Amino acid sequence: MYIEMVDETGQVSEEILKQTQEILEFAAQKTGKENKEMAVTFVSNERSHELNLEYRDTDRPTDVISLEYKPELDIAVDEEDLLDHPELAEMLEDFDAYIGELFISVDKAREQAEEYGHSFEREMGFLAVHGFLHINGYDHYTPEEEAEMFGLQEEILTAYGLTRK
């Protein structure tokens, strides 16, 4: 999995950048998304507030904003076309590779780690996995969706070794 990471805050350590890369690759493997691409931008509460207002019409900062990328291709392609034109198949695969972008508030992660009584590393891992699942179609609007998403999220974090303690 290719992950572009940008730290707009200048506060994210190399260890956290490495952990974020690793846990997202781990989550991608667990969900069958290894051949995908995404971006992660670490932001301040101020920037998170701006983004939350712009994308969600919510006037406050938030911990993670997930922007799922859903490309629309306005052409019909059948299997014969793909067999006759392997370059078309490759182009379509590349077209579908980018899955989205996460904006993680470093300030909120610190606040929440303290509030929930676990490490900053755990909170950053949690936010990365939570956002990753959102850009891959998981949600928590209904009790059933919540059980599925939160169950998978906890399974990934625990298997990776980021527990609440």
Curated annotation (Swiss-Prot):
Under InterPro entries, the record lists: MetalPrtase_cat_dom_sf_prd, YbeY, YbeY_CS
Please state what class of enzyme this protein is: hydrolase
Report residues binding Zn(2+).
Answer: H130, H134, H140
Q: Which Pfam families match?
A: YbeY
Q: What is its EC number?
A: 3.1.-.-
User: Which UniProt keywords are given for this protein, alphabetically ordered?
Assistant: Cytoplasm, Endonuclease, Hydrolase, Metal-binding, Nuclease, Ribosome biogenesis, rRNA processing, Zinc
Q: What are the subcellular locations of this protein?
A: Cytoplasm
Q: Which GO terms describe its biological process?
A: rRNA processing
Q: Which GO terms describe its molecular function?
A: metalloendopeptidase activity; RNA endonuclease activity; zinc ion binding
Could you tell me what the cofactor note in this record states? Answer: Binds 1 zinc ion.
Q: Does the keyword Transmembrane apply?
A: no
Cellular component terms, GO, for this chain's entry? cytoplasm
Tell me what this protein is called. Endoribonuclease YbeY
Q: Which organism is it from?
A: Streptococcus sanguinis (strain SK36)
Provide the taxonomic classification. Answer: Bacteria, Bacillati, Bacillota, Bacilli, Lactobacillales
